């Protein structure tokens, strides 16, 4: 028996999902802590709207004692048609966060496994994500490969 249990989150988990998303950003960009905190309300509104419209599927991992160990979400996004696939919607894995005391104990793997299973059950042909430096080895273990996305930051 595993020491963890996976559940699919609901709107009732909104506070947790917001907190975990902000903690994820603070882990990745500690120097931006103040501006990350300033984004709390817009993050809350965004997560709430995506759950209510059905495009955000949260996965929450708890210990057998009901303590929160981590969370992550699938966001179903729309893309342009592309050769080799007739799908214009695809799952995007985001907001992966594991509570520090449960890191390296398989929590993130439980979430990734659930996201892959959910995506297959819903007949998607791919999953995309952006990996942090720390998360890269985990995703490679599951067969994710790096793509050629580039980004240009525009000044306002």
Regions found by a protein language model. Give the residues of each.
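Conserved acetyl-CoA pyrophosphate-binding loop and the N-cap/start of the following alpha-helix
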Residues: 102, 106-114
